[in-house]
Amino acid sequence: MKKQLLAVLLCGALLTGCGTAAVPQQTGSGASGSAPEQPVVQRVDLDDFSFGGCASLSLAGNLAAAKAGDTSYEAAHDKAAFAGNSEEAWQRLLDGELDVVLAYAPSAEMQKKLEEQGISLVEVGTDALVFLAGSSPEEDTSLDWTKQDILTAYQKDNTSGWTGYAAAAGSDSRRIFAAVFGSDAPGVTMQSGEDTLTAACPHTTGTVCYTTWLSLLRNGKPNDTSIIAVDGMLPGDTAEEGKSYPLTVSYYLAVRPGLEQNDPAMLFYRWLGSDAGRTWLAEAVLPPAAEETGESDDMSQAS
């Protein structure tokens, strides 16, 4: 398992083809219509439209903006607006603050608001919930858990020897946890007046916390932690024999309604929402691309 993860994390820029990422099929996500095909990226000026989304997807979004704008990741980062959670991102689209949004699936209430405005979503990629086990440097922390093992670590007064720390309330990773496990994290251990649902994960021996795979690629893995395999699979593993990492989640693209087809926002939306755009994005977010961003390697708190 360590060898598989190492292979994913050490693929160089000249080997961006090593390993594959699942490319989801285009869907309407509860609304009619889908992004028209524009298989070849057409250069757009990032000053001519507003693009953003939730903070957890900033790696994917900034890479896409850099590609379409024919500019550097850093320049795209300065232009795009990736902050907050997905509900806030979808609201910014409704309010007209953003022309194009990249975010995780909205709540049922938000989905209804989007549909009422004629906004449909196009599935453009997959992310995953990743669990990190804290340990001492000298310990061997190669772990392979089941989903039930993870839930046990988050139960009050469990005897597993592990204490689960959840992400902040309202964060996308907290919502994804509830989606993939069917309920919110129930941990209630107190630490300096905070419970483990809100306290920053200390990444010490016996602690478990989580983030998203794309956030982990962007920020780096905290020291003295190991990624927990789930059902024998790591998030970077290539699916084989019908087996894949089980804790995955889709993310979506949407554009403000009423724009002309030659509007820069529409050109960008049609490219990224096309088969070619989704295929490119799946390859672009592989670890070598994350290394080229130059973002901080410190992730002191799950997001």
Residue map of PLM features:
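Exported/periplasmic ABC-transporter solute-binding proteins
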Residues: 19-99, 103-115, 119-303
